[in-house]
Regions:
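Conserved small/polar residues in nucleotide/adenosyl-binding loops
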Residues: 315-317
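Generic hydrophobic, helix-prone segments enriched in Leu/Val/Ile
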Residues: 12-13, 51-58, 105, 109-116, ...
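Extended, charged amphipathic alpha-helical segments
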Residues: 145-308
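Extended, regular secondary-structure scaffolds
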Residues: 62-181
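A motif-centric signal for short, conserved binding hotspots located
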Residues: 312
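Exposed, low-complexity/repetitive linear segments and helix-based recognition motifs
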Residues: 8, 97, 109, 128, ...
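Extended, helix-rich architectural segments
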Residues: 1-93
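A general structural signal for short secondary-structure junctions and capping/turn motifs
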Residues: 52-57, 103, 115-116, 154-155, ...
Length: 317
């Protein structure tokens, strides 16, 4: 059994840092109308919360702008489909996107290389084909899979990247040479595993702790086979009664052998691990809880008790 705490964490952070009350606006009224229309046409308000949750899980995300029939579109790209090639202290300016396709029994990889040059943004498309998903394969013309796609496309006069990379506010202590982010739970993997071990053990408690009644085998119904031998049979679907043979059958009484459940011990262990996880993530103690014994709190109490959680959400924003 698993608690899926990693997803719970990412969903919680996503709702804290982006909600329906969020507003995106531009000072210039003309551009503001354009931006609002682009966001609306690309289902930004519906798709971004889920996309943001994945970004917390994967260590980042990219929103890429492209044209489709002269209409501005947004592509929500997971961090594992992007590799940066050039960056500065502010942002990633160049990078390669990778997309996988399957057609006619072949596996294709389309690489989209974004570069900033003196005359504008240059985008190069490179297509590779392979018989196996595991191999990069050989280079083939882009037209083999995309007849209308050009090898190179230039957006003259554009001096800003046509994509925006963002990442969680978690220092990357695993890869120092790349400006990439880490999943918010990257340094809490051991704790997440421990939580799942405890939760799995709790589930096993209910399986192993089912009612068990020991009975002498003489109490089991019997039938006679074709040879006239007595054969005892037992309902294999019955999980309550357990039959035993004994040398001294009269001393073997019907007895309840049900084991008591160790629910309290498991819950306390889960609470401890969840508090450790909250500390590792930067949440306030008790933010992640297995049960709720605190009752209703006022807004002032919530703000006081969860100041670390509120501070963490502001950092990610």
């Amino acid at each position: 059994a698993m608690t899926n705490m990693a997803k719970v964490i990412c969903d919680k952070l996503a709702t804290m840092t982006f909600s329906e009350q969020c507003d995106i606006s531009v000072d210039d009224e003309k551009y503001n109308d354009t931006v609002s229309k682009v966001l609306e046409n690309n289902c930004f308000w519906e798709r971004f919360p889920e996309f943001l949750s994945r970004a917390y899980a994967l260590g980042g995300g990219i929103i890429k702008v492209y044209l489709e029939d002269n209409v501005i579109r947004l592509n929500y790209i997971n961090a594992d489909r992007f590799f940066p090639t050039k960056w500065n202290n502010r942002q990633i300016t160049e990078g390669i996107f990778c997309n996988d396709y399957v057609q006619n029994g072949y596996f294709y990889k389309l690489f989209e290389y974004h570069t900033l040059q003196s005359d504008g943004v240059h985008i190069y498309h490179i297509l590779r084909r392979s018989d196996s998903r595991s191999y990069l394969g050989q280079s083939v013309p882009v037209s083999e899979l995309f007849p209308k796609l050009e090898y190179e496309r230039v957006f003259k006069g554009v001096q800003t990247p046509l994509f925006c990379y963002f990442k969680p506010a978690v220092g990357n202590n695993m890869v120092f040479d790349l400006p990439l982010g880490l999943p918010v739970f990257a340094n809490s993997i051991d704790t997440l595993r421990e939580i799942d071990v405890i939760f799995d053990s709790l589930e096993r408690e209910f399986i192993l702790g089912k009612k068990r009644i020991i009975i002498p085998s003489e109490c089991i119904k019997s039938i006679y086979d074709s040879d006239g031998n007595e054969v005892k049979y037992f309902d294999t679907d019955d999980e309550v009664y357990q039959a035993f043979n004994a040398d001294d059958a009269p001393k073997l009484n019907i007895s309840d052998n049900t084991q008591s459940l160790r629910v309290t011990e498991h819950v306390e262990a889960l609470k401890l691990q969840l508090n450790i996880l909250s500390t590792q993530l930067g949440f306030s103690p008790g933010t992640l809880s297995f049960d709720s014994n605190s009752g209703v709190k006022t807004a002032t109490e919530v703000a006081a008790d969860e100041k670390d959680t509120l501070r963490l959400s502001l950092i990610h924003i």
